[in-house]
C-alpha cells in the first residue's frame, strides 16, 4: 500500500495512522506533507517520535483526537487493534446514533467509525482488521453503517498465518472504503458486505467471500479461531514470499480504480467502484 501511495498522481496531502506502533504504515511516506499518528503505549510512542520526528506523533489513544480533525484527512490507514476493549468517547456516548454508541464496546468497531469521521468526503479508509468485522452477526449494524456512509472499494481476506512472525495466527481482512455521505443507494457488492451466511457448524462467513473469492490462501480447513470458536482457517504456503507480489498488484489496481474517480481532488465525485 505504501508503494501505491508514492505514485505522484495519488499522493495524499494529509495521512493519519490511528494505531501506528513503530511506524510500519508510514515508513515509506516521507514525501507526504502532513502525517499524524496515534500510539497509546508510551514506550512505543517515544520510539515512533524518535524514528519520525517530522510526523505529528500523539502518544495517547485515538479517541483523544480533537474535533478539529473531523473531515480533515485524505487517507486513514492502519493495522488496527481488535477485541472487546471498551472505549470512552464522550461524543459517541452521547450520540443519538445507536451504532455509534454500541461501537464503544469493541475497539475495532470504534476505530472504523471514528476513522470515517476524520476523513474528508472522497477520502480513503484502509484498515487491516479482525475478520470478525465482516463475519460476525453482531457486527451487521456496523457493516450497514459503513456502506451507508462510504463506498465499499474492496475487501481481501488475508491468510491466518500472515502474522506468525508476530506470534499470532488470526483471521484478518483488508477493508478499503471511500467516504461518501451523500450516497442514496447501495451496490450489490455493498449489500453482500452487510450480510453473512452459515457454512457449517455455525460458522458464518461474509457474503463477499461466499465463493472464496478475494481470499489469499493455498489451503482451507474447518477449525477454530483464536477464541476457540468454530471457524474456517485459510493458510498460505510460503506466505512471506508471494504475498508482497499479490498485495502490490492489488493495491496498484485498486488505486488505479480510485484515480478514475479523481480521488485526490478536493471536490471529487464519489462514484461506486467495481471490485479490482
Language model features: what each stretch is:
Residues 1-85, 129-132, 175:
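Conserved S-adenosyl-L-methionine
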Residues 33-34, 54-55, 92-96, 142-145:
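Glycine-rich, phosphate-binding/catalytic loops in enzymes
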Residues 40, 102-163, 172-176:
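Conserved Class I SAM-dependent methyltransferase catalytic core
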Residues 80-111:
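Mobile active-site "lid"/loop adjacent to the S-adenosyl-L-methionine
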Residues 81-83, 132-134, 162-163, 181-183:
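Conserved nucleotide-binding/hydrolysis micro-motifs of P-loop NTPases
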Residues 91-93, 141-143, 170-172, 191:
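Short secondary-structure boundary/capping segments
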Residues 164-272:
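Flexible, glycine-/basic-rich loop-and-beta segments that form/coincide
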Residues 274-276:
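Charged, non-catalytic accessory extensions
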Amino acid at each position: 500500500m505504501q508503494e501505491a501511495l508514492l505514485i505522484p498522481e495519488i499522493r495524499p496531502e494529509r495521512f493519519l495512522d490511528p494505531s501506528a506502533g513503530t511506524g510500519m504504515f508510514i515508513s515509506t511516506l516521507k514525501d507526504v506533507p502532513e502525517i499524524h499518528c496515534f500510539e497509546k503505549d508510551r514506550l512505543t510512542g517515544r520510539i515512533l517520535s524518535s524514528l519520525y520526528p517530522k510526523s505529528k506523533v500523539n502518544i495517547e489513544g485515538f479517541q483523544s483526537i480533537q474535533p478539529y480533525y473531523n473531515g480533515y484527512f485524505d487517507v486513514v490507514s492502519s493495522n488496527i487493534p481488535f477485541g472487546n476493549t471498551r472505549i470512552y468517547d464522550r461524543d459517541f456516548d452521547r450520540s443519538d446514533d445507536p451504532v455509534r454508541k454500541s461501537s464503544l464496546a469493541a475497539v475495532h468497531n470504534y476505530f472504523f467509525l471514528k476513522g470515517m469521521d476524520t476523513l474528508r468526503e472522497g477520502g480513503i479508509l484502509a484498515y487491516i482488521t479482525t475478520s470478525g468485522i465482516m463475519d460476525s452477526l453482531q457486527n451487521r449494524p456496523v457493516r450497514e453503517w459503513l456502506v451507508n456512509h462510504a463506498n465499499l472499494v474492496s475487501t481481501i481476506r488475508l491468510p491466518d498465518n500472515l502474522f506468525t512472525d508476530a506470534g499470532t495466527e488470526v483471521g484478518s481482512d483488508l477493508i478499503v472504503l471511500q467516504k461518501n455521505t451523500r450516497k442514496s443507494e447501495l451496490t450489490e457488492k455493498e449489500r453482500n458486505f452487510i450480510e453473512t451466511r452459515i457454512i457449517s457448524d455455525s460458522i458464518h462467513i461474509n457474503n463477499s467471500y461466499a465463493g472464496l473469492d478475494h481470499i489469499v490462501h493455498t489451503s482451507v480447513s474447518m477449525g477454530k479461531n483464536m477464541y476457540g470458536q468454530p471457524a474456517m482457517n485459510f493458510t498460505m504456503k510460503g506466505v512471506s514470499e508471494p504475498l508482497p507480489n499479490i498485495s502490490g498488484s492489488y493495491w496498484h489496481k485498486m488505486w488505479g480504480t480510485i484515480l478514475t474517480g479523481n480521488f485526490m481532488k478536493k471536490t471529487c465525485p464519489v462514484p461506486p467502484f467495481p471490485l479490482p
